[in-house]
Amino acid sequence: MDLSAVKSTGLSGQMHGATVLDSADQGLRPCILWNDTCANAKPAQLYGSIVFPRLTGPKLLWIKHDKPNLFDRIFRTFLPKDYLRLRLTEEPASEMSGTAGMSWLDTGPKDCRNKIFAVTGQDMSYMLHWVGGCEQSGAVPASFREQKIG
C-alpha cells in the first residue's frame, strides 16, 4: 500500500483505557481497557468526588497502590486512540471529551484537575494540546507517509 496518497485520517475510539508509557514512549504493559475491573471504589474515594472506577484516573491509582514498581516507571499515560495519534503524528494531543473522560480535564475552564494529578502523581505538562472533536490535532510526518505497507 502506498501511503503517499493518504490525505487525512481520523481517530475515533475506545475511551477510558490506560496506555502507560516510559520516558522513551515504550509501553510498560498491555493497555488496561475500560471493562477491566482492577480499579475498585477506593481510588474514587481519594479524589474527593464520585469517579467511576473504570475511568483512567482510578486505573492509575490501582497501579500506584498495587504495582508500585510499574508505577514508578510511568512517564505518561494516554487513551488508546491518543497513543495511536502519538505514533502517527509524533505529537501528544487529545480531544477534550477524551481527557474529561479520563477524569482529568475540567471542561469548564479547560484545565487539568490538579487534585487528581496530585493523587495519581501524573504530570500533564506533556499533554497541553487539547482539541475539539472535529479539529485537526496533528500531521503525519513525511517519514511515515513514505513507508510501504503490505
Task: Please identify what each model-predicted range represents.
Residues 2-60:
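Active-site phosphate-binding/coordination module
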Residues 11, 47-150:
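Gly/Ser/Thr-rich active-site cleft segment
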